[in-house]
């Protein structure tokens, strides 16, 4: 199938990847855009893995403030160089991450960061639920595993579906940007302040 400039342009707009890489991906996938996106994502994962050990001493703090001024989120996004920290796609990623934190209120960045006590508590709850449903213990264990993976998607930032495109996770979003900009990137600390939630907690405490 002939790869047209229009096809390449459309893929570039959807992925942010360079024109030559988009053309190559479309050629590899016989012009199928969906498969080309998957191809680019897999290439991005490989690039991200190669760059994972590099030091990330530059970056910026992305912020998001809700229109009512009562909800604010901040995310520390790290990269290798000041040059990339000033790149439009890196800045946009930091803003998207802050918006994600504001919308979903994650507990941690990745599953390994989740407090073990919290995880064990959730596992026990899921196990008791499965047993109460009449499941044998060996089946209950498999059910627990599935529910824990679902729990990760709720509380771990990297595992969450991206609020602007739920077909990709935040990990996908990060790896896509690494593939485009060619540097290792890491999400550091994040914070979320919601005035309405704070007022409600104070009222309950009185």
Curated annotation (Swiss-Prot):
Its main location: cytoplasm. GO terms for cellular component: cytoplasm. One of its GO terms (molecular function) is translation elongation factor activity. Transmembrane segments: none annotated. It is found in: Cytoplasm. It holds the Pfam family EF_TS. Residues 81-84 are annotated as: Involved in Mg(2+) ion dislocation from EF-Tu. InterPro entries: EF-Ts_dimer_sf, Transl_elong_EFTs/EF1B, Transl_elong_EFTs/EF1B_dimer, Transl_elong_Ts_CS, UBA-like_sf. Signal peptide: none annotated. It comes from the Bacteria. The keyword Magnesium does not apply. Gene3D superfamilies: 1.10.286.20, DNA helicase RuvA subunit, C-terminal domain (1.10.8.10), Elongation factor Ts, dimerisation domain (3.30.479.20). Keywords: Cytoplasm, Elongation factor, Protein biosynthesis. Associates with the EF-Tu.GDP complex and induces the exchange of GDP to GTP. It remains bound to the aminoacyl-tRNA.EF-Tu.GTP complex up to the GTP hydrolysis stage on the ribosome. Belongs to the EF-Ts family. This is Elongation factor Ts. It comes from Maridesulfovibrio salexigens (strain ATCC 14822 / DSM 2638 / NCIMB 8403 / VKM B-1763).
